[in-house]
Curated annotation (Swiss-Prot):
E.C. no: 3.2.1.52
Protein's UniProt name: Beta-hexosaminidase subunit beta
GO MF term set: acetylglucosaminyltransferase activity; beta-N-acetylglucosaminidase activity; beta-N-acetylhexosaminidase activity; carbohydrate binding; identical protein binding; protein-containing complex binding
Impact when changing P504S: In GM2G2; decreases the isozyme A transport out of the endoplasmic reticulum. Lowers its heat stability. Affects the ability of isozyme A to hydrolyze GM2 ganglioside
Length: 556
């Protein structure tokens, strides 16, 4: 019987209606799930605005901050030398720092003409800087430079005291971070007392200028950001297999033939500029010339330096590491490193020594003969150690110290006392730290801080959570741990992405190496780092965001 006139849906129409209803329910459920995920993520890392107030990074050793607010007027505030300071107007390093930090404090904001009721507020009119010992104004920073300082902020004069200029530079950065604008646009600072010094003496950033050439202006920008985060070592991995951009005075063919192009080189003037720019910010420039591996670009401009590699048919088919059997190798290296010691004033040279591939040496009959003559048998680690020992002796004769990657220690090279070992292999690095320090060698750590290994999300947290001294050993061993480095290797990094890939991720490493072991509060770190990141952006550093949020300066 046909039901006419009732308007009931036919079976196909009913099925379509049911499917539509089911689809709508599923979409609603998925929306709810997505909302729950978003809420959970927001709860884990809340969206933080750039709220007013100081955000110190890295956190000083001791901070006593009162609620008493003082004000600064850009046109009526000066940074100058204390009358009893051992440094004075002739100290170019401090004079330039005074101008620089006045600009950091006031120059990146729209100056605000304050309403009349705010003109009479208590003001800080001057920051007096006092160096109490020999200033070292014209010196270069070194591994034992004193970076301690005290800062007393009160009206009408704030006082910054440091034993050396290096501590004054760190204190100026802290003072600049204390200043903020209130809701009226007034430059404000809390009455404060700060006593500060770094936990570790070596706090480095590694840049790689071989895989990709980095223009000098990018290196200088990196040095600025390092100063904002109180890093004090630029580890300059300047050459590698891919290119040789260092323009040697003695061996110009190294860069003429080994660089990507003649415009992709660092001239002597470029190198001097980087070193002086770093010095004015209290930063050492540590050059790395990695041998005997990672040297293919060297061979293009230096004949007979590299080892010929042979196929199974005894045919020459490529070149490998530096040839460790020839006297000419060591004559070249002696002359080359003498030049490096004169160009780079730092007391250390990083000699590399990592990832040496033995297959080429194994294929070369002359290398095999040399091994037999020396009694090395077939243990190519002994040949590697033979080479490393020769290079270490060269460095010692030019009165420089050596830093090496951990393989040099692992492969039983005879290291001179005081040789610094850099631990970079992420697997079981605490055990490696224990072994190196048990043998009496100073150590620096980079294994957990390879910033080229990127991941989506807030990976700064894992860098921040590392406790460098969390390895087995005596107190004497722990004292041999002198610091660490955040490394940004250059296979996938050039001038377009170096800065946002470094910052603020490297900032997490900076606080871990400067601040007390007890500074561990992740929520507080997130709040401070979010605002510190905004401050870096205001100062011209293209630091990537930590999470959802905003910076106050974005609408200025």
């Amino acid at each position: 019987m046909e039901l006419c006139g009732l308007g009931l849906p036919r079976p196909p129409m009913l099925l379509a209606l049911l499917l539509a209803t089911l689809l709508a329910a599923m979409l609603a459920l998925l929306t709810q799930v997505a909302l729950v995920v978003q809420v959970a993520e927001a709860a884990r890392a809340p969206s933080v605005s750039a709220k007013p107030g100081p955000a110190l990074w890295p956190l000083p050793l001791l901070v006593k901050m009162t609620p008493n607010l003082l004000h600064l007027a850009p046109e009526n505030f000066y940074i100058s030398h204390s009358p009893n300071s051992t440094a004075g107007p002739s100290c170019t390093l401090l004079e330039e720092a005074f101008r620089r930090y006045h600009g950091y404090i006031f120059g990146f904001y729209k100056w605000h003409h304050e309403p009349a009721e705010f003109q009479a507020k208590t003001q800080v009119q001057q920051l007096l800087v006092s160096i109490t010992l020999q200033s070292e104004c014209d010196a270069f920073p070194n591994i034992s430079s004193d970076e301690s300082y005290t800062l007393l902020v009160k009206e009408p004069v704030a006082v910054l005291k440091a034993n050396r200029v290096w501590g004054a530079l760190r204190g100026l950065e802290t003072f600049s971070q204390l200043v903020y604008q209130d809701s009226y646009g007034t430059f404000t600072i809390n009455e404060s007392t700060i006593i500060d010094s770094p936990r570790f003496s070596h706090r480095g950033i590694l840049i790689d200028t071989s895989r990709h050439y980095l223009p000098v202006k990018i290196i200088l920008k990196t040095l600025d950001a390092m100063a904002f985060n109180k890093f004090n070592v630029l580890h300059w991995h300047i050459v590698d297999d891919q290119s040789f951009p260092y323009q040697s005075i003695t061996f110009p063919e190294l860069s003429n033939k080994g660089s990507y192009s003649l415009s992709h080189v660092y001239t002597p003037n470029d190198v001097r500029m980087v070193i002086e720019y770093a010095r004015l910010r209290g930063i050492r420039v540590l050059p790395e010339f990695d041998t005997p591996g990672h040297t293919l670009s060297w061979g293009k401009g230096q004949k007979d330096l590299l080892t010929p590699c042979y196929s199974r048919q005894n045919k020459l088919d490529s070149f490998g590491p530096i040839n460790p059997t020839l006297n000419t190798t060591y004559s070249f290296l002696t002359t080359f490193f003498k030049e490096i010691s004169e160009v780079f004033p730092d007391q250390f040279i990083h000699l590399g020594g990592d990832e040496v591939e033995f297959k080429c040496w194994e294929s070369n009959p002359k290398i095999q003969d040399f091994m037999r003559q020396k009694g090395f048998g077939t243990d190519f680690k002994k040949l590697e150690s033979f080479y490393i020992q020769k290079v270490l002796d060269i460095i010692a004769t030019i009165n420089k110290g050596s830093i090496v990657w951990q393989e040099v220690f692992d492969d039983k090279a005879k290291l001179a006392p005081g040789t610094i070992v850099e631990v970079w292999k992420d697997s079981a690095y605490p055990e490696e730290l224990s072994r190196v320090t048990a043998s009496g060698f100073p150590v620096i750590l980079s294994a957990p801080w390879y910033l080229d290994l990127i991941s989506y999300g807030q990976d700064w947290r894992k860098y921040y959570k590392v406790e460098p001294l969390d390895f087995g050993g005596t107190q004497k061993q722990k004292q041999l741990f002198i610091g660490g480095e955040a490394c940004l290797w250059g296979e996938y990094v050039d001038a377009t992405n170096l800065t946002p890939r470094l910052w603020p991720r490297a900032s997490a490493v900076g606080e871990r190496l400067w601040s007390s072991k007890d500074v561990r509060d992740m929520d507080d770190a997130y709040d401070r780092l979010t605002r510190h990141r905004c401050r870096m952006v205001e100062r011209g550093i293209a630091a990537q965001p930590l999470y959802a949020g905003y910076c106050n300066h974005e609408n200025m």
